[in-house]
Amino acid sequence: MRILSVGWFRKTSNTSFHRHEALKKHSTYIDKVEAGPTSLSLAYRIAFRSFQMGLPVKLPDQMDVNKKIRTLITQNGYDIVWIDKGLTVDASTLLFIKKKLPNAKIVSFSPDNMALRHNQSQNYLESIPFYDYTFTTKSFILNDLMNLGAKNVNFIHKTYSENFHYPRKISNKEKERLAADVGFVGVWEKERCDSIIYLIKNGVKVKVFGDGKWNEYQDKYDNLTILPGLFSEDYPKALQTFKISLCFLRKMNYDQQTARTMEIPACGGFMVAERTEEHLELFKEGKEALFFSSNEELLEICKYYLSNEEERKNISNAGLKRCQASGYSNEKTVEKMLNIVLGLK
């Protein structure tokens, strides 16, 4: 199978990179087009802001993604053109692919809620009808995507990478730097910040790896440590070394599950996540992960399991086994998606 893969591949912790690596395992030949700029230009920022204000302004193609796609399509034949999110991919480029390679399948994948404007672009909205298959990790937006013109819309759960998210041998120096009673890795949002402050005000020590607005809380509370975000192998190591690893959902995306949902248990971490129907389907509550619906319940869980190491270990081990047994990996999930595209499932 010959694949052209388009996405953001610069960081080894990027899920787009992990999907590309999974695609490589299922291809006989693969090319890639890097769509992620090292920094966003002023023109890009202005265009994005204008689009968010409701104007039909397209994002500038800083990385010449469309030109590179057209060049490769002209030079090589592909069975599948896989586009991760594709905010700067133009409809005219997809039509070019269809003209040059009428038998190729064009696939759209995004881990974000693409029914919401803050995740979209004008380029994306104009391109939606020309994708042959659309995959989303949001079970509740299938009809929304179809109303935008998407065809063959499929829901796929979040995933972890077998080559990146796994239990590691961790040195004592790494433990000193990364370990925490309760830890969280991620961006600031009000609800999750409120939950963390509730914990620290009730005697629980929390370590946060995050940038931006988190820096405003540096040295503000005795029980709170703020450190820079993690984007290397320190990320899975941290999830493994936290006694309790918090998994919050993005309220602005109405998430039912998130990347951390799979990554924490896959790394051998003890996950405490927000309670949702999808979380309860993915992991057995109290056996493979813990869930909470209020700050009071979160505090109760943290205090109990910080004092019960053996139970934490048993649940962490069970969560890891569930990830493996249920096929939550990128490799298994990408294989499932490719089978759908090829009509094998």
What are these regions (language model features)?
Residues 311-326:
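A short, well-ordered alpha-helix in the C-terminal region of glycosyltransferases
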Residues 258, 289-295, 304-309:
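Conserved acidic donor-binding segment of nucleotide-sugar-dependent glycosyltransferases
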Residues 82:
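N-terminal Rossmann-like NAD(P) cofactor-binding module of classical short-chain dehydrogenase/reductase
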